[in-house]
Regions:
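Flavin (primarily FAD) cofactor-binding/catalytic cores of flavoenzymes
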Residues: 1-48, 96-448
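Generic N-terminal leader segments that precede the first folded domain
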Residues: 2-6, 24, 33, 55-57, ...
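Short, solvent-exposed coil/turn linker segments
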Residues: 38, 59-73, 182-183, 328
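Glycine-rich phosphate-binding loop and adjoining beta1-alpha1-beta2 segment
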Residues: 52-66, 247, 281
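Flavin (FAD/FMN) cofactor-binding and adjacent substrate-gating region
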Residues: 62-95, 254-266
Length: 448
């Protein structure tokens, strides 16, 4: 981990400051090290260590993508940061090749992400939650990033890769905590509720996504006898579109095609491809869940209760269990469900104009008035992920988004690993272009 000595941190002018060191930031750091070793970059990460989906590392769950769509392979198959090299270095390559599974286990991939991050520890400071961004001009235009601990960091270019914000429906927002949580917090919230109750739990899972089905299966598989209330607006879990033709949406050529399409064409393409990534479930998970429900019926039990075509109309979190008011969407029939824990498998917010979207990442609020917006009020983003300044705003240092651009770049920016390494190269080329390739390691400052 980078040593943060306070004064040096505030005086150093880096070439690049990255906010967020998740998979997107790690992939970019790997590309910078291998392809631009003279460029001085520093990433700020709010967590105390690198992590990938820590709240959803469920036993038996997989990544749903090819193992070589990793942090480096598509950019450089000879990179030491590939998943295969991780397996080689950790002595598990042959064992992995013998596993009868299409995709890597999520727990294995999380270890891979941490392993790569450890190799790049000189490029990151952990425990630094970025809270503010401002623009300064002395000695050259640059960004100043403030953090919750009071330290500030400066960079001639800024890359924002904070990940998407969990989407929490309005009725649930006042109740978030130990008994109502987003799926991204599932594992540790469940552990706390188990400890508090000391017996089987009633858990309501809201949504019909891959995460919703995996959580239902995980609860049923545990030896605690939990009961699951699966609450969904549709008739049931739907099968994910895994056609190789649809999977070509994760090709860089499709990213070019999508980016250059009209707004109407993008909307049409997004609707066509939605079942390949949203509100749908892999076949193996669906089949396992259905067999579990059938087997419960054979034994005279009902531990997975489906509340089909239902929406939540009210939430109460007084003494005792959480009370959810439900309404059947077609008949209007009302009923109530009580739960010791409510898990919201309701997805994440994108950058876009829709009701559930955000116009820009929250961290950019202080500088948003100087950034170009489209006619819907959403950040303009160019093909290399550069966010141009607003006309008349004057000179601005370059700003890039890393992994937040599904609205403009398609499914490759939808939180998947599939194009991470190629996006890192595109970002690197954009940074070089915007800074000027002849300018590197500004001020010659030592890393803090």
């Amino acid at each position: 981990m980078t040593i943060d000595n306070g004064r040096t941190a505030e005086e150093t002018l880096h070439d690049v400051i990255g906010v967020g060191f998740g998979p997107g930031g790690i992939a970019l750091a790997a590309a910078l090290e291998e392809e631009a070793p003279d460029m001085d970059c520093l990433f700020l990460e709010s967590r105390s260590e690198a992590a990938w989906q820590p709240g959803m590392l469920l036993r038996g769950s997989d990544t749903q993508h090819h193992p070589s769509r990793d942090l480096a392979t598509l950019r450089n198959p000879r990179s030491r940061y590939t998943f295969l090299n991780y397996l080689h270095e950790t002595g598990r390559l042959l064992a992995f090749l013998n596993v009868p599974a299409h995709f890597p286990l999520r727990r294995d991939y999380a270890r891979y992400v941490r392993w790569v991050a450890a190799q790049l520890s000189s490029s990151v400071v952990y425990g630094r939650r970025a809270t503010t961004v401002s623009v300064a001009s002395d000695p050259v235009p640059h960004y100043v990033v403030g953090t919750a601990c009071g330290r500030t960091y400066r960079g001639r270019a800024l890359v924002v890769g904070t990940g998407r914000t969990p989407y929490v429906p309005a009725d649930f927002r006042p109740h978030l905590g130990d008994r109502v949580c987003h799926s991204s917090e599932y594992t540790w919230r469940l552990e706390k509720r188990r400890a508090a109750k000391g017996g089987p739990l009633d858990v309501a899972v809201v949504g019909a996504s891959q995460s919703a089905a995996e959580i239902a299966l995980d609860l049923h598989s545990a030896a605690f006898g939990d009961r699951v209330h699966a609450i969904m607006r549709g008739f049931g879990y739907r099968l994910k579109d895994t056609s190789p033709f649809s999977e070509e949406a994760y090709f860089p050529e499709f990213t070019d095609y999508y980016f250059n399409a009209s707004r109407e064409a993008r909307a049409d393409l997004a609707a066509q491809l939605r079942p390949s990534n949203y509100s749908s479930v892999d076949q193996d998970v669906l089949e396992s869940l259905y067999v579990r429900r059938y087997e419960d019926g054979v034994d005279g039990e009902e531990r997975i209760l489906l509340h089909r075509n239902h929406e939540v109309t009210g939430v109460e979190t007084g003494e005792g269990p959480v009370r959810l008011a439900l309404r059947e969407r077609h008949t209007g029939e009302a009923k109530e469900v009580t739960a010791d824990l409510v898990v919201l498998a309701t997805g994440y917010r994108d950058l876009g104009p829709a009701e559930h979207d955000e116009p820009y990442p929250g961290i950019l609020g202080p500088v948003a008035d100087g950034l170009a917006l489209d006619d819907t009020g959403v950040l303009r983003v160019e093909r290399d992920y550069f966010v141009p300044p607003r006309q008349g705003a004057g000179a601005r240092p370059p700003l890039f988004l890393n992994g937040l651009c599904e609205n403009t770049h398609g499914l490759g920016d939808a939180g998947s690993f599939s194009l991470l390494s190629l996006r890192a190269r595109t970002l690197l080329e954009g940074i070089r272009h915007r800074l000027g390739t002849e300018q590197t390691a500004a001020d010659g400052g030592a890393r803090d």
